[in-house]
Amino acid sequence: MEVLRTPDDRFVDLPGYDFAANYVDDLPDYEGLRVHYLDQGAKGANQTFLCLPGEPTWAYLYRRMIPVFSNSGARVVVPDWLGFGRSDKPVDDAVYTFDFHRNMMLAFIEHLDLRNITLVVQDWGGILGLTLPVDQPNRFSRLIVMNTAIPVGVSLGDGFRAWKEYVASRPNMDCGALMKRACPHLSDLEAQAYEAPFPDQRYKAGVRRFPQLVMVEPGMEGIETAKRARKFWQDEWEGESFMAIGAKDPVLGLTVMNQLRKTIRRCPEPIVLEEAGHFLQEWGEPIAQAALKQFGDLY
């Protein structure tokens, strides 16, 4: 397997981001593939926030939320999916599958022996992340869910179809420009931090593939796992949940999220940010504070 590793100098002096890099390269079945993660706060803390980014982002997306969570006394772990951020990037698009990503994250959680997890998800962080407790139910205790879905082979509508076609027609999509359009309040340097992991098109196999993997047609890999996940959240979930919605998201906005809320047992009324879009973490500080307040954590 041909693998690329983004040079460290691409990540120097990123605005608002001074977190130390951590790596693991010996996950079972992923030996030699280096996975990057942030690990903030006390490792012996009672609560662990596991924050999962999505397409086409990386740990940088959570920079506004990490201090809020860690200041509450919790541990905060933010991994990058393979193909994204500071994690290694297989060159062949075909390497990237639903199970490739999901099994890596299950192994990562086992490797760090994360417990009492507050799962924090958005976009693919949720499409994949919301299936994880099915196989590790005793590790998860709370959920913070933003602009995502649990697709089970049904269309997500014209907005997603347009997004999928958009990415397919741009094999070297400028992730920084995308983020600037989606989050106009970002500075140019902040937006460029999302292009930092990708020196050229060869590094973007994961970016190209994620939209193709969303389970919007019958028979796609991941559908059966997603169906199990829906049943888990609806019938078996015993933990606390917090939902926030960016109302300007044209794909995974209010309609999709209100449907998802019905799937999550005892999920309370969501917080809706009318000014926010798909990448809700870029409005993340007040969201993190509201979640802690709802959970009763000290802040």
Where are these regions (language model features)?
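Helix-rich cap/lid subdomain of alpha/beta-hydrolase
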Residues: 152-210
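Conserved serine/cysteine hydrolase catalytic core
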Residues: 24, 204-262
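Conserved hydrolase catalytic core segment
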Residues: 115-154
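The conserved beta1-alpha1 loop
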Residues: 50-54, 122, 245
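A short loop-to-beta-strand scaffold at the N-terminal edge of the catalytic core in hydrolase folds
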Residues: 30-40
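Conserved acidic catalytic loop of the alpha/beta-hydrolase fold
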Residues: 99-117
